[in-house]
Amino acid sequence: LIIGGGTSGAAVAWSLASAGMDVLCLEQGSWIDPWTYPTDQDDWELHYNTDYSPDPNVRKLPVDYPVNDEDSPISPLMYNAVGGSTIHWSAHFPRFHPSDFRVRSLDGVADDWPITYHELEPFFDMNDRIMGVAGIAGDPAYPKKADRQTPPIPLGKTGQVMARGFDKLGWHWWPADSAINTVE
């Protein structure tokens, strides 16, 4: 039994089912109709700050519960529905950098992770294959990663204008990895 089939729950469910185990995932909330998500509506900012807020204390939908964050410097980013908080990240799927695991050593903040990027790298690659991450391998701003199964999401008009501007200025840009199957 797995409570929550978002990114982590789905990965655990896949690994257990692959080993021959029967798996049941339970969700708090229902399916979200992608056509009702307000990103392409004129009043999207209103929805993002009310019924689609990442903070359940603001959202207050029937499936939500309050989270006491008064002693925390951060507010929760969570969503109670099938897919969990992945609903908020729009399938944008960047990887950590090796330096993200050493923030105490490099920047003097927080704590270093007890593991390194390179120890996790094979699991990053396996997860990318399971999820079907679309993109192009070879971005020099990131460590080497496995080839992507499908091509990146095509650039829209705004992205094309930005890419031309970046090229003109000699700035680096790269199509983002996305957890979306771009090939039927």
Regions found by a protein language model. Name each.
Residues L1-S105, V109, P114-H118, P122-D125:
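N-terminal glycine-rich phosphate/pyrophosphate-binding loop and immediately adjacent elements
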Residues N49, Y65, H92-R95, R104-E184:
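Conserved redox-cofactor binding core of oxidoreductases
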